[in-house]
C-alpha cells in the first residue's frame, strides 16, 4: 500500500496544491486554529514592520497537512513582500541556492519546504547567508580557485519540516523564531470546512461540516479533501446541499469511519485482536498477517493509531488498547480495563 493512495493521507496529492491555493487564507485574521502561533506571529510581524526590518528567520514544524506552507505565504502577505518557494531535495548544489538568494529583493521571504533534507554542502552556503546576509562563492578550480563574498539584501528564510529532530544544530540555531503546529480540534476543523465550502459556493449545514471535521484526523488538508469528495456525493444524491446525513452517507461510502479510520487502519487493529489476542506481537508477524510491508505499518498505519490511543509499542511488541475493542463493539479483556487513553480528539458528552 502506498500512503498517497489513501484518501485520509496527510501528504499532498497531485494537483491538490492548486486546489488548496484557491481556499488558502492570506491573512492572519483568516487563519483558523493554532491560537498561540497566530498571536505570536502577529506580534513578531507588527514589530518587524514597525522597525522597517525583515522578519527573523522562522522555522515551522509539525505533522504534514497542518498549514506550514499556508503560514509561510501569510507571513509574506502580512509583511508586504514577495515569496520564493522551493524544497530541500530540489537544492542539490550550492549554485541552486545561490541562484535563489541572488534574485531576492530586500525583505523577501524564501520558503524552503522539507528543509531537513538539505544536503550538507548546501547548508554550509546557507549559514553565512542567514547570519550575515553574505554569499560565499568559489571562483575557478584547483590552485587558482578563490572565494569571493557577495552581499545579499536582508531576507527572511522560512523553513518547514515534519522532522525537526533531523535538522542539524547549526541550522536550527540560526532560526530566531520557531513555531510548532499542533493537530486541530474538531471545532476549528468544522470552521475550516465551513469557510472552504463558502469559497467553493457549496451550501453546507453546521452539522454537515462537523461530521466531516470529526473524521479528518485533526488535519485541515484531509478535511478539505473530504469536503471535495462529499461535494461530489451531495451534487449527485443530495441536490448539492451538505447535511449531516449526506456527509455521513458519503464518508461511509468512502470507507472513512467516525474516527477517521479507513479499511487499512481497521484491518490492522482487527488482526491484532483476532489473530494475536490483542498482542504483544512483533511488527514482522503483524506485517505477514495483513500482507503489508514492515515500513508501511511503522510509517503509515501505526503513528495515528498510537497517537489516538488505539495501540501501543512496548518492549515485547505491539498491543492494542481497550479503545480498539470498544471501537469494534467487542468485549474488553479485563487486563485492559484500566488502560489510559491517548485520544487527542475525543469529545466529552458532559
Curated annotation (Swiss-Prot):
EC code: 3.6.4.-
Any GO molecular function: ATP binding
Residues that coordinate or bind ATP: 23-24, 65, 68-70, 131-133, 174, 184, 221
Major enzyme class: hydrolase
GO BP: DNA recombination; DNA repair
Primary location: cytoplasm
Residues annotated for Mg(2+) binding in this entry: 69
Keywords assigned: ATP-binding, Cytoplasm, DNA damage, DNA recombination, DNA repair, DNA-binding, Hydrolase, Nucleotide-binding
Catalytic activity: ATP + H2O = ADP + phosphate + H(+)
Superkingdom field: Bacteria
Chain sites annotated for binding DNA: 294, 313, 318
Region Head domain (RuvB-H), residue ranges: 258-350
Chain intervals for the UniProt region annotation (Large ATPase domain (RuvB-L)): 4-184
Functional note: The RuvA-RuvB-RuvC complex processes Holliday junction (HJ) DNA during genetic recombination and DNA repair, while the RuvA-RuvB complex plays an important role in the rescue of blocked DNA replication forks via replication fork reversal (RFR). RuvA specifically binds to HJ cruciform DNA, conferring on it an open structure. The RuvB hexamer acts as an ATP-dependent pump, pulling dsDNA into and through the RuvAB complex. RuvB forms 2 homohexamers on either side of HJ DNA bound by 1 or 2 RuvA tetramers; 4 subunits per hexamer contact DNA at a time.
Domain remark from Swiss-Prot or TrEMBL: Has 3 domains, the large (RuvB-L) and small ATPase (RuvB-S) domains and the C-terminal head (RuvB-H) domain. The head domain binds DNA, while the ATPase domains jointly bind ATP, ADP or are empty depending on the state of the subunit in the translocation cycle. During a single DNA translocation step the structure of each domain remains the same, but their relative positions change.
Protein name, per record: Holliday junction branch migration complex subunit RuvB
Species of the source: Ectopseudomonas mendocina (strain ymp)
Amino acid at each position: 500500500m502506498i500512503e498517497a493512495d489513501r484518501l485520509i493521507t496527510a501528504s499532498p496529492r497531485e494537483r491538490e496544491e492548486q486546489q488548496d491555493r484557491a481556499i488558502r487564507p492570506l491573512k492572519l485574521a483568516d487563519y483558523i486554529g493554532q491560537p498561540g502561533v497566530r498571536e505570536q506571529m502577529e506580534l513578531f510581524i507588527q514589530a518587524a514592520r514597525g522597525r522597517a526590518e525583515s522578519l527573523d528567520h522562522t522555522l515551522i514544524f509539525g505533522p504534514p497537512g497542518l498549514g506550514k506552507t499556508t503560514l509561510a505565504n501569510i507571513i509574506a502577505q502580512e509583511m508586504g513582500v514577495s515569496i520564493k518557494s522551493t524544497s530541500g531535495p530540489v537544492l542539490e548544489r550550492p549554485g541552486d541556492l545561490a541562484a535563489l538568494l541572488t534574485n531576492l529583493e530586500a525583505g523577501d521571504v524564501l520558503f524552503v519546504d522539507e528543509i531537513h533534507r538539505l544536503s550538507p554542502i548546501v547548508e554550509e552556503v546557507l549559514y553565512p547567508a542567514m547570519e550575515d546576509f553574505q554569499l560565499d562563492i568559489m571562483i575557478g578550480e584547483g590552485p587558482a580557485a578563490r572565494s569571493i563574498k557577495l552581499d545579499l539584501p536582508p531576507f527572511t528564510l522560512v523553513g518547514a519540516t515534519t522532522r525537526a529532530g533531523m535538522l542539524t544544530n547549526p541550522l536550527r540555531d540560526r532560526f530566531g523564531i520557531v513555531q510548532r503546529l499542533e493537530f486541530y480540534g474538531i471545532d476549528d476543523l468544522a470552521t475550516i470546512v465551513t469557510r472552504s465550502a463558502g469559497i467553493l459556493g457549496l451550501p453546507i449545514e453546521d452539522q454537515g461540516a462537523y461530521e466531516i471535521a470529526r473524521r479528518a484526523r485533526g488535519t485541515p488538508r484531509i478535511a478539505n479533501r473530504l469536503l471535495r469528495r462529499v461535494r461530489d456525493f451531495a451534487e449527485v444524491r443530495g441536490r448539492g446541499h451538505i447535511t449531516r446525513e449526506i456527509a455521513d452517507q458519503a464518508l461511509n461510502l468512502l470507507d472513512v469511519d467516525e474516527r477517521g479510520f479507513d479499511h487499512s487502519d481497521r484491518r490492522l487493529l482487527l488482526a491484532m485482536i483476532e489473530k494475536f489476542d490483542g498482542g504483544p506481537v512483533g511488527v514482522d508477524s503483524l506485517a505477514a498477517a495483513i500482507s503489508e510491508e514492515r515500513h508501511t505499518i511503522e510509517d503509515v498505519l501505526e503513528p495515528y493509531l498510537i497517537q489516538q490511543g488505539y495501540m501501543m509499542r512496548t518492549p515485547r511488541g505491539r498491543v492494542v488498547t481497550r479503545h480498539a475493542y470498544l471501537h469494534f463493539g467487542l468485549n474488553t479483556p479485563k487486563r485492559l480495563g484500566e488502560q489510559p487513553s491517548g485520544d487527542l480528539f475525543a469529545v466529552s458528552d458532559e
